[in-house]
């Protein structure tokens, strides 16, 4: 319904379908051979790109890391910034001084290095940058999780894309993963059931080491040029994911392994089982180099909006369709564990682009679900101990313990609207739950133990992985927003809905578009 206060012309225009592209308008159309002002504003001027001194300074940074220095200099000059805050995760802080020196040398701005810990894109600290007097900040190493129009300061996101050896990556996949789906399950997955039945502590001997076989010479000759599969064989289905630094490499990998009958070199690229190397026994026929699978794979790059295709966070990962395995490109396990939790039945592999090793990764889903369910049940017991009427918040010796609702203050980790949604949920519960808001930048067992015995349960809005990974270390239940909804009966728990032999699915959708937790950050309701 149109606003009656608007003039008729405005009301009429409001009924017209909206254009999909909305940009700056020009009084006259641009002539051929000229660029619009909008395009020029976003292009890096040639004098910056060809600045010999600037290019020499950039050489002080690793060439395989894209810090987008030219773009940064352009934006600092364009915004006439006088003080620029630089926020980098700990893994990139070794380059902070060089970047700051370049900015101060080639612009009129001062650079401030924001040294507080940065765990992810949710930790962008525009509030501190403003308090320091900055009029612009550059956030490195993470995607634009907090939109630029919501920050309190002009913000430039630099993903820091990292170049990888795409040829080695593709050949490693082709050496270790048969492109024939049946052969993939027989040689990789089915043997895991046999290995899992070996008693703990039994000496299995050298003959029991992992050995993934490629196509034999006879098979290669029969099937043509080392493809290792018949034309009618179903291809192995792989889901490819990574952090934002390697999403471009995912696209290249998909192109490389979905091509049919590619020419590949017989270059070994060994597989590590659970991060333990397995050496060759030397009993291979003729000690010939292993053959690779040169056939076509079926590769998908899943997406959980608003993230980029293939990008996953420690708290947000998509549910996968029918795939035989997932391949994670990146170092460490934090992000990988997110998609493993969301897809407990999908075998997971990790390719580390730094060590160039491929490992089979596992996660104890049963233990995680049990530990988190115990926290929820303990929280429910504290609710059952409350009086049916609204309890008083006035402290006295017989007062029931409160729930502490923690608003994370490390960057943008905590959302005040989400805090409102949670407190409204507690107040409107069948048994109203007394609570007290708590502001904390970082949580620790010793810090929360100081609130004993007045608080029976903590709810934290900082990061779901704090509860999943470290909840067992706290004296009192430390619930995420999702677990809180389960505890008060507003959401179906992972233990309530059985989905296969391993139980229900624990969702990893904290920032996924349309999830209750994403909606609460925008509307203060679930």
Annotate each predicted stretch with a short phrase.
Residues 2-133, 139-141, 146, 447:
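Metallocofactor- and cofactor-centric catalytic cores in central/energy metabolism, strongly enriched
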Residues 253, 335-435, 442-449:
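Redox- and metal-dependent alpha/beta enzyme cores, enriched for Fe-S-associated oxidoreductases
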Residues 2-7, 11, 16-21, 90, ...:
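N-terminal glycine-rich phosphate/adenylate-binding segment common to multiple enzyme folds
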Residues 134-151, 320-338, 381-389, 393-406, ...:
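Extended, charge-rich low-complexity interaction segments
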Residues 101-109, 256-266, 289-297, 345-347, ...:
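Short helix-loop-beta junction
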């Amino acid at each position: 319904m149109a606003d009656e206060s608007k003039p008729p012309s405005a009301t009429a225009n409001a009924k017209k379908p909206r254009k999909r592209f909305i940009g700056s308008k020009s009084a006259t159309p641009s002539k051929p051979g000229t660029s619009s002002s909008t395009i020029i504003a976003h292009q890096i001027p040639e004098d910056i790109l060809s600045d010999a001194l600037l290019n020499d300074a950039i050489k002080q940074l690793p060439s395989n890391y894209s810090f987008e220095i030219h773009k940064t200099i352009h934006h600092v000059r364009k915004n006439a910034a006088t003080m620029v805050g630089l926020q980098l995760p700990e893994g990139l802080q070794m380059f902070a001084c060089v970047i700051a020196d370049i900015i101060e040398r080639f612009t009129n701005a001062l650079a401030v290095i924001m040294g507080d810990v940065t765990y992810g894109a949710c930790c962008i600290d525009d509030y501190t940058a403003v308090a320091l007097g900055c009029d612009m900040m550059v956030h490195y190493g993470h995607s634009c999780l907090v939109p630029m129009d919501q920050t309190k300061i002009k913000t430039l996101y630099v993903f820091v894309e990292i170049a990888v050896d795409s040829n080695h990556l593709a050949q490693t996949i082709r050496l270790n993963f048969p492109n024939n789906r049946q052969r993939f399950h027989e040689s990789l997955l089915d043997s895991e059931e046999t290995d899992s039945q070996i008693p703990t502590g039994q000496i299995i001997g050298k003959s029991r080491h992992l050995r993934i076989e490629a196509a034999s010479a006879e098979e290669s000759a029969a099937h043509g040029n080392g493809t290792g599969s018949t034309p009618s064989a179903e291809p192995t289905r792989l889901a490819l994911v990574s952090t934002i630094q390697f999403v471009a490499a995912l696209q290249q990998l998909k192109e490389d392994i979905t091509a049919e009958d590619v020419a590949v070199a017989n270059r070994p690229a060994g597989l590590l089982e659970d991060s333990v190397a397995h050496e060759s026994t030397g009993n291979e026929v003729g000690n010939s180099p292993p053959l690779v699978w040169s056939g076509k794979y079926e590769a998908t790059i899943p997406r959980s909006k608003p993230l980029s295709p293939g990008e996953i966070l420690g708290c947000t990962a998509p549910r996968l369709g029918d795939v035989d395995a997932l391949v994670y490109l990146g170092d460490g396990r934090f992000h990988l564990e997110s998609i493993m939790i969301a897809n407990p039945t999908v075998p997971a592999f990790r390719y580390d682009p730094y060590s160039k090793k491929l490992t089979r990764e596992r996660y104890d889903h049963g233990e995680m679900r049990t530990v988190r369910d115990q926290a929820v049940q303990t929280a429910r017991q504290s609710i059952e101990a409350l009086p049916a009427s609204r309890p008083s918040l006035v402290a006295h010796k017989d007062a029931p313990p409160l729930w502490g609702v923690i608003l994370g203050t490390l960057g943008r980790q905590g959302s005040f609207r989400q805090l409102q949604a949670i407190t409204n949920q507690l107040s409107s519960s069948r048994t109203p739950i007394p609570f007290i808001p708590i502001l904390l930048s970082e949580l620790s067992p010793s810090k929360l133990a100081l609130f004993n015995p007045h608080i029976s349960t903590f709810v934290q809005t900082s990061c779901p992985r704090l509860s999943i990974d470290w909840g067992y270390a706290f004296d009192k239940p430390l619930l995420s927003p999702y677990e809180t909804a389960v505890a008060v009966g507003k959401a179906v728990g992972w233990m309530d809905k059985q989905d296969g032999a391993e139980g229900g699915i624990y969702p990893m959708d904290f920032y996924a578009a349309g999830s209750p937790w994403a909606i609460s950050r925008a509307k203060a309701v679930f």
